[in-house]
Amino acid sequence: MKLGAVILVAGVGIPDEEMEKFLEMKRPTIFEQMIVSYQRAGVADIALVTRDGMADKIEQTLHRRGVTFLDIESDSFELAVLKGLSYLSDTCERIFVGDIRFPFFQPDILVMMQKRQAELLGAVYGGMFGDLICTSQACARNICKKLEQQIEESAEMAEGTVRSIGVAAFWK
C-alpha cells in the first residue's frame, strides 16, 4: 500500500513573520522533523503546499529529502488541501493531511491510523480532534470534488456580490 502525506504550510493562517521564524530555526528544522516522522511511518510521497514562492526558502533545508513542493497563489486552506490531495490521490492508497503548526507526532500514530480501514480518520488527543487526518484514495477524490465545487460557488458568489453593487469586475 502506497502512503502519501500533504503538509500544509499555506492556508493555515500563519503570518509571514511567524513563517520567517520557522525558516530561521536551527537544524534540524521543524520541516525536517515532520518529514522524517512521516518517512519512518512508511510514507513514500510527501507534498508540501506553500504559498507565494515560499517553496524556494524551504527547499534549501529540505533538498534530498524526497519532498514535492506545490505552490499556490493565495493563503486559502481549501485551495491548499485541494492542491495536495489532487496531487497524491492518483498514486497513493492512503493519504495523511497535516498542518505545519502541529509538527510533532509519533510515527507509530501514523502506522495505527493507516491500518484502520476507515475512509476518513482524524487523530484525537484528550478527547478533541487534532490536525492530522488520514483518508482513503476514494475519500480524497470525493473531498477534491467537494472542494472544487465550494471554490467555484465562492467565486460565483463573489462575482454576484460585486455585480449587485454595480462595480465593474475584472476576473483573471
Where are these regions (language model features)?
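N-terminal nucleotide-binding beta1-loop-alpha1 segment
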Residues: 1-18
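Conserved N-terminal catalytic core of the sugar/cofactor nucleotidyltransferase
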Residues: 3, 30-94
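Catalytic-core segments of class I nucleotidyltransferases/pyrophosphorylases
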Residues: 125-172
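Short beta-strand/turn micro-motifs composed of small residues
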Residues: 7-9, 49-50, 99
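Short glycine-/acidic-enriched loop or helix-start segments at secondary-structure transitions
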Residues: 17-18, 57-59, 106-109
